[in-house]
């Protein structure tokens, strides 16, 4: 039976009063907050049932990204690999395609590409989580015992941490979870803490004293912080007298993540095991509507994270992804000895569009994440399992792109494609000078330069989801700059002409990375196109950009085009270009909760 949808109605907030702009007689419902992406408050209310979705419901629905069959989703929560099965929990609204009534959705997979949706793992049914079962993590305790720790909100919206266990560990899908009798196990009840800014506990790790640790995002005396806690049994927690790390120049940190990495080694490290000599640690936080991170060391004596480089201006902090990507969560995959990360990509159309579609939000392709050999930044690449969806491979070798050239990549489905291309620079002498101030706002520089403005080296890259007359198209490209003794590469994903629709967010995303062009003249680009979701990986995963696009061309099968291009003054060679059509994955097909 179809679930009732919920209408979103903009409301005007005046002090403590809420005034609806329009309220039909059948509307009754609670007030919902913002969605974490900067969109406004809405009234959550029941709409008439059995309303037919618009064509946009299928036109923009992705073919191989993780999303539920319908309704709202946001943060990934507690991903894990257990007894041969991958589990993905996620923030989910059972009742409609808008933020509110959040429970833990639950899906399982054996290959990270095809997913079966199960009944929600956690629902709002106790005083400590009646306002929502918010984001959390899973930790595998000794003896192979998974345990969920998650944030719950009470009726007054105070936040606290709660525990849940599998009801039956012999069930391969862990379909039922039991909440601890002593929930909440952790409250923000110490001086200087903010009870409504205390959420998103990390996966636990074991310290040198044999005690468990975890971090919780919060505020401490007005500072943003990853608050640190200790426990002997993962049930009873004590706050450490100092945070894992804090900063006085940023907003509250959501969805912190803390994990170990080895420079130049793409093998993952399990935090519940001994960390090898020479390992670094990454501290990730979700802030300013993006995911940022620092690389440093975990000082065991101080029980604190120490960044390699302390940067006060958070505009200069490194990012996991430079596009529409937030609330990411990683986990150690013992199956293939790797660390996997994925994030939430929100819709960038409008709440009324979400209502018409009947769904909102998706998760990015799972990515392997590791530390570059120089120890300065994290690298990411789509997990290899996604390649199982490739079909209809086409290849081109030895292309040469001069200024103004446009080469069409034919015989693949331009709506669902995986494109890998290497750009080899014939000369690096013509690189334009680099201005360090651009690092403060690479998006602004992408917007000012654009793909049509010639430079010394670049722009060169891909034009995707292009209509016949190019009225609609998205550009993913590079520009190369010379900075003293090194080269800086700007990667952009320009959405300003991605759709003819005026009611969309259409920015020009961008990020810089250093590249040793004296040693290696080839810059790689991989772009995964999946209807309204586009993920691009530049320079071997040094910069990643997730974009959401809504072109009208998606309504007409076979009408979109993909091109390689060069608008720079210097000739660019393409020694290898490979592209594939991507098959549709089986992702949370709606068959009811008894699908397995």
From Swiss-Prot:
InterPro entries found in the cross-reference section: ConA-like_dom_sf (IPR013320), Fructan_Metab_Enzymes (IPR050551), Glyco_hydro_32 (IPR001362), Glyco_hydro_32_C (IPR013189), Glyco_hydro_32_N (IPR013148), Glyco_hydro_beta-prop_sf (IPR023296)
pH dependence: Optimum pH is 5-6.
Position of the signal peptide: 1-20
Gene: 1-FEHw3
Superkingdom in the source lineage: Eukaryota
Molecular function in Gene Ontology: fructan beta-(2,1)-fructosidase activity
Temperature dependence: Optimum temperature is 25-40 degrees Celsius.
GO biological process: carbohydrate metabolic process
Catalytic activity field: Hydrolysis of terminal, non-reducing (2->1)-linked beta-D-fructofuranose residues in fructans
Expression by tissue: Expressed in the stem, particularly the penultimate internode. Little expression is detected in roots and in the peduncle part of the stem.
UniProt keyword annotations, A-Z: Disulfide bond, Glycoprotein, Glycosidase, Hydrolase, Signal
Known role: Hydrolyzes inulin-type beta-(2,1)-fructans and beta-(2,1)-linkages in branched fructans. Has low activity against beta-(2,6)-linked fructans. May play a role as a beta-(2,1)-trimmer during graminan biosynthesis.
Glycosylation sites recorded in the entry for this protein: 168, 236, 248
Protein name: Fructan 1-exohydrolase w3
Keyword Cytoplasm part of the UniProt annotation: no
Catalytic residue list: 75
